[in-house]
């Protein structure tokens, strides 16, 4: 669930983006969706006249609905920013992503998916425990990094209880975090790397 501060930050980002586009002379319409209102909300917008800056991460009250929004935009032939629904769905399936990376020969930290909190075959510490089927860092806090088997079992139980899904356990790699964004369909333009600054985070 989003905290009020997160919602305010999101609104501030939307206002900054909107004012920047309006300053360049582009018409801007800010749309909020609730429940099944997206079809109705988009009905007044001609796909050939608008680009959707898709910042929707979830339909309120509908878990794992980010891909649903992208699918609806595609079904209406809207041009939109962000990943297609198939990619969004894959990104929420961390186990699938790990299997894919391994199959392509790309290095990835040691990992395992556990429905049993005892995780008898895990022996690599420190480790990080996260929900296996959630977006980005949902379910991750300072408690997610575990140093021994007792902490591991506690955190796996936390994932099971609070998210009702298996836990993904990985070898914890300490260090800096970078994001690399790409633009394009087919031929991709890679943007400069951006480092995440966590200095203001309490956990």
Q: PLM ranges: what are they?
A:
Residues 85-88, 101-102, 139-147:
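Flexible, glycine/proline-enriched loop segments at strand-loop-helix junctions
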Residues 127-155, 177:
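Glycine-rich phosphate-binding loop of ATP-grasp-fold ATP-dependent ligases
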Residues 149-203:
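Phosphate-binding site of ATP-dependent enzymes
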Residues 1-79, 86, 90-92, 96, ...:
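ATP-binding N-terminal substructure of ATP-dependent carboxylate-amine bond-forming enzymes
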Residues 102-135:
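Rossmann-like NAD(P)H-binding beta-loop-alpha module
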Residues 46-49, 71, 97-102, 127-128, ...:
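Short, hinge-like loop/turn segments at secondary-structure boundaries
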Residues 28, 79-80, 108, 127:
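Hydrophobic beta-strand scaffold residues
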């Amino acid at each position: 669930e989003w905290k009020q501060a997160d919602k305010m930050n999101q609104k501030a980002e939307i206002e900054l983006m909107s004012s920047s586009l309006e300053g360049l002379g582009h018409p801007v319409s800010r749309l909020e969706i609730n429940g099944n209102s997206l079809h109705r909300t988009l009905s007044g917008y001609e796909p050939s006249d608008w680009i959707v800056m898709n910042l929707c991460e979830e339909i309120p009250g509908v878990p794992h609905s980010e891909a649903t929004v992208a699918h609806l935009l595609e079904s209406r032939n809207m041009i939109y920013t962000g990943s297609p629904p198939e990619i969004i769905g894959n990104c929420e399936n961390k186990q699938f992503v790990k299997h894919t990376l391994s199959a392509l020969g790309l290095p990835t930290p040691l990992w395992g998916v556990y429905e049993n909190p005892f995780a008898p075959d895990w022996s690599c510490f420190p480790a990080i425990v996260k929900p296996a089927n959630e977006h980005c860092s949902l379910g991750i806090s300072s408690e997610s990094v575990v140093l021994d088997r007792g902490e591991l079992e506690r955190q796996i139980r936390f994932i099971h209880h609070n998210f009702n899904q298996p836990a993904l356990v990985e070898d914890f790699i300490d260090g800096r975090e970078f994001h690399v964004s790409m633009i394009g369909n087919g031929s991709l333009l890679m943007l400069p790397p951006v480092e995440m600054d966590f200095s203001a985070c309490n956990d």
